[in-house]
């Protein structure tokens, strides 16, 4: 048996996102988001699912916070629905929406749980999309207005803030690959969006400092990790592009004030470049307090200039590893490698694992429980790598499992379950899974024994 220790002040938590759990999509003055529009469009989401009700967390604050308390987490990462507080994206404030988040945060604090707030987890107000969305600089100004509102409303209660969750998804998965809302397929638009997101991030960080908010602010890119099929220059560069596409492209401008040259050159060779205007890079390039690491899987890649290699000429091939039910290969060592790379490149900043978890669609057994041993095994092997990172001097301060409960899994609908808590979508009954009790034990002890 080996013991894997974590510091006594380690921030154990779980994570969710507004559109995936809240429901109440047209109640109490909430405006429409791009995900409402997308999910209501036939063929965009599997089974025609949508977030109209989701987990109904909007009406179940006390019940869900009690689950968090029972689990024993120190922090709860959630996101704010921008159209719930600013239905048109700017202008008139929806007080009922703000009151909901005050109730949630107050309930968390009353139960000894720190709120860890994400400002933007993909649910752009549709009113702003109608004006060009993140492809327009109008949305940068709108985001600054929204961020200032939330800092003033909740800055005295929330000490940790994330500006954007997984900007690669918002830029490229949503506007180049077309898989997520708003469903565009335009590479230049995706590059424009990625730049505008970073400028908006810079605006929010500036406001956070100017308002004197006490706490930390950072960003959570979906930093992928690709390993080369062969140790050739071509395959290693193919992996560098995959990692740079989702990670370095967002973190380099923040930390170094410029985009990574290898990615700029790649885009320019294809005929594309980001829409930089005077002052943008200076605004983006300012200190943040932490980086959020979202990690689920790795890929093995090789150079392929053909169709299979895609825009990056980088083809993902199977590692031959076991897969979760969503089809993602399991490679826990990739989490360590990603933490090591991020620490080494960016000066060993404070890191939080802001998402890590597994999709397994285990149902209720005859005994009324959900025996999700595969999820327990997945979490254990990744926590071992997190512990290893801490032992090796990486400044990792917390771990937030994805997710507290089964929820609306974006374009996959409700068919893919990531939760520690099972949700019956017909009755909305919550049932903690075996992994819930296992994770509760890890949190209470502060160590793993395997």
UniProtKB/Swiss-Prot annotation:
Any Gene Ontology biological process: cellulose catabolic process
Q: Which UniProt keywords apply?
A: Carbohydrate metabolism, Cellulose degradation, Glycosidase, Hydrolase, Polysaccharide degradation
Asked whether the keyword Hydrolase is assigned, the reply is: yes
| Taxonomic lineage from the root | Bacteria, Bacillati, Bacillota, Bacilli, Bacillales
* EC number(s) stated in the UniProt entry for this protein: 3.2.1.21
Q: Which organism is it from?
A: Niallia circulans
What's the protein called, per UniProt? Beta-glucosidase
The protein's superkingdom reads Bacteria
GO-annotated molecular function? beta-glucosidase activity
Recorded hits in InterPro entries, A to Z, give: Glyco_hydro_1, Glyco_hydro_1_AS, Glyco_hydro_1_beta-glucosidase, Glyco_hydro_1_N_CS, Glycoside_hydrolase_SF
Its UniProt entry gives the catalysed reaction(s) as:
Hydrolysis of terminal, non-reducing beta-D-glucosyl residues with release of beta-D-glucose
Active site, renumbered: 166 (proton donor), 355 (nucleophile)
The record's similarity note reads: Belongs to the glycosyl hydrolase 1 family.
- One short Pfam name that applies is Glyco_hydro_1
């Amino acid at each position: 048996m080996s013991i894997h220790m974590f510091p006594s002040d380690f921030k154990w938590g779980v994570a969710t996102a507004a559109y995936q759990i809240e429901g109440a999509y047209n109640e109490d003055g909430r405006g429409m988001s791009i995900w409402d529009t997308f999910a209501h469009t036939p063929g965009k989401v599997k089974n025609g699912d949508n977030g109209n009700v989701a987990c109904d967390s909007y009406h179940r604050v006390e019940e869900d916070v009690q689950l968090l308390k029972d689990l024993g987490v120190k922090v709860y990462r959630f996101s704010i629905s921008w159209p719930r507080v600013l239905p048109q994206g700017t202008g008139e404030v929806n007080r009922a929406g703000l009151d909901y988040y005050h109730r949630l945060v107050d309930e968390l604090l009353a139960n000894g749980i720190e709120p860890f707030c994400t400002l933007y987890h993909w649910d752009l107000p549709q009113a702003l999309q109608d004006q060009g969305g993140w492809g327009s600089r109008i949305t940068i100004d709108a985001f600054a207005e929204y961020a200032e509102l939330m800092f003033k409303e909740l800055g005295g209660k929330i000490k940790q803030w994330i500006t954007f969750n997984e900007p690669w998804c918002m830029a490229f998965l949503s506007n180049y690959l077309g898989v997520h809302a708003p469903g565009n397929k335009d590479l230049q638009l995706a590059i424009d969006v990625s730049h505008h997101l970073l400028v908006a991030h810079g605006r929010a960080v500036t406001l956070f400092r100017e308002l004197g908010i006490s706490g930390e602010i950072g960003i959570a890119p979906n930093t992928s990790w690709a390993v080369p099929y062969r140790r050739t220059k071509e395959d290693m560069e193919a992996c560098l592009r995959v990692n740079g596409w989702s990670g370095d492209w967002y973190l380099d401008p923040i930390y170094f004030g410029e985009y990574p040259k290898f990615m700029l050159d790649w885009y320019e060779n294809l005929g594309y470049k980001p829409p930089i205007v005077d002052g943008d890079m200076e605004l983006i390039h300012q200190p943040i307090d932490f980086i959020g690491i979202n990690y689920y899987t790795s890929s093995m890649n090789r150079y392929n200039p053909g169709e299979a290699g895609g825009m990056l000429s980088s083809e993902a091939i199977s590692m031959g590893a076991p897969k979760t039910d969503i089809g993602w290969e399991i490679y826990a060592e990739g989490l360590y490698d990603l933490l090591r790379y991020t620490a080494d490149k960016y000066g060993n900043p404070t890191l939080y694992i802001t998402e890590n978890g597994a999709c397994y669609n285990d149902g209720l057994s005859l005994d009324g429980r959900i025996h999700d041993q595969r999820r327990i095994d997945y979490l254990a092997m990744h926590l071992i790598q997190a512990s290893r990172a801490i032992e090796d001097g990486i400044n990792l301060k917390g771990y937030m499992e994805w997710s507290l409960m089964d929820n609306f899994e974006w374009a996959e609908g409700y068919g893919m379950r990531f939760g520690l808590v099972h949700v019956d979508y017909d009755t909305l009954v919550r049932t903690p899974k075996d992994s819930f009790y296992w994770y509760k034990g890890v949190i209470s002890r502060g160590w793993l024994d395997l």
